[in-house]
Amino acid sequence: MGSINGSKVKTIIIACDAGMGSSAMLAARMTQKLSSFQVSVKHSPVNQIPEQVDLIMCHEGLAARTRSLRPGKVVVPFKLFIGDPAFDKVIAAVRDSADITG
């Protein structure tokens, strides 16, 4: 598990199996919420997550695989695609320069 201060987060990847539907929708939503903080939010299949990423968010069922593919990166899992508190936690940490662990 890694940790990062929200003020250091400049790139977030929303990862899913295919990197198309659900992750694209979530990336668009997070982009809107984080636009005033100059944070880039993109989507990707788990197997293609780029090295240059500060934080990865993925469904909890993909968290172990994501951590094994990108060791040392902060991985924040979520359960629900809509309304999960993990998204609000990340947004608040970026806004408040708080630590994010995952």
Regions found by a protein language model. Give the residues of each.
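Ser/Thr/Gly-rich flexible loops in soluble cytosolic domains mediating phosphotransfer, phosphorylation
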Residues: I14, V76-G102
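Short, Asp-centered acidic motifs that coordinate Mg2+ and/or phosphate
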Residues: L55
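Alpha-helix C-terminal capping/helix-to-coil transition sites in glycosyltransferase folds
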Residues: E51-Q52
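Conserved active-site segments centered on acidic
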Residues: G2-V46
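Structural signal for conserved beta-strand scaffold positions within catalytic alpha/beta enzyme cores
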Residues: H43, C58, V76-P77
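A short helix->loop->beta-strand "cap" motif at the edges of active sites that frequently abuts
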Residues: R70-K73
